[in-house]
Amino acid sequence: GRILDFQDFTSSTPSVSLHDDSGHGTHVAGILAGSGQVSSGLYAGIAPDTDLLICKVLDHEGNGNIQTVLKGIDWILKIKDSYPLHLVNISVGGRPTLPPGQKKLLLDAVEHLWDLGLTVVVSSGNYGPRPGTVAVPGTSPKVITVGVPDTLPLFRTGHSSSNYSGRGPTDHCIKKPDVFAPGTGIISCNSRYISSMQSASVRPSLFQRPTFLSSQPYIAKTGTSMATPVVTGAIACLFSKYPDLSNVEAKLRLHNSCQPIPGTESGWGLL
């Protein structure tokens, strides 16, 4: 997919220069809409023709806070009428132990997006496996919350189990996550990749710092952040065929498309 707009909210002066110093956002974007060009299509995203608007809300260590996420949501509200925006993928989440006031701020923000007609897909977080560990704002009854199942009987990922996904019930006794998708050992784009052609113009000293540069275009990562764009990409494909669907109708279609799997204590099943 193409990146139509970008905004970085992690510094005191918001930047519009496209960059990713943590790798999280690039990996998520690749799962959703990567072209797979470097791998001859092998590692293409779920919906490779999808256009992207990207908010950077995590710093170079992959950490974030409520304020940067809220700034990102405010930006979406400001630009949503300038683009054909249907979906919002939120592959971040606050701890279930957030103070009530901060929880409310996040929940109100994502539910406002939903009430405006946008389909909001969020991760359930990696705070499991105990009950009541869904990350905020995944506890919202309106948004689509994505988790990773404890077992993946249909796939061979090299991981026999994944026992990290946040799970319900929520504080209001709502079952969550809504849907499950693969999120363990997912291969997608590496933000530190530099091609052989690019390397010719890079200072040799940088190659002594493998933390910053890599010759590998793809990398495997694990988490509900990786499962969330799988679901978002599937809904993007749905909208490409049925562009007039509402977010409620899309949620119902998703519900009816899930396959129940063993080991899942709640939710609709595996997409």
Language model feature labels by segment:
Residues 1-7, 16-67, 81-87, 115, ...:
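Subtilisin-like serine protease catalytic core
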Residues 7, 83-190, 253-258:
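Catalytic-core segments of hydrolase enzymes
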Residues 11-17, 159-166, 215-220, 264:
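Short beta-alpha connecting loops at secondary-structure transitions
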Residues 24-28, 65, 72, 92, ...:
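Extended, hydrophobic alpha-helical segments in both membrane/secreted and soluble proteins
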Residues 29-32, 53-59, 88, 133-136, ...:
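Hydrolase catalytic cores
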Residues 39, 71-74, 164-165:
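Alpha-helical scaffolding within the catalytic cores
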Residues 73-83:
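Short, well-structured alpha-helical segments in soluble
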Residues 270-271:
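Short helix- or helix-capping micro-motifs
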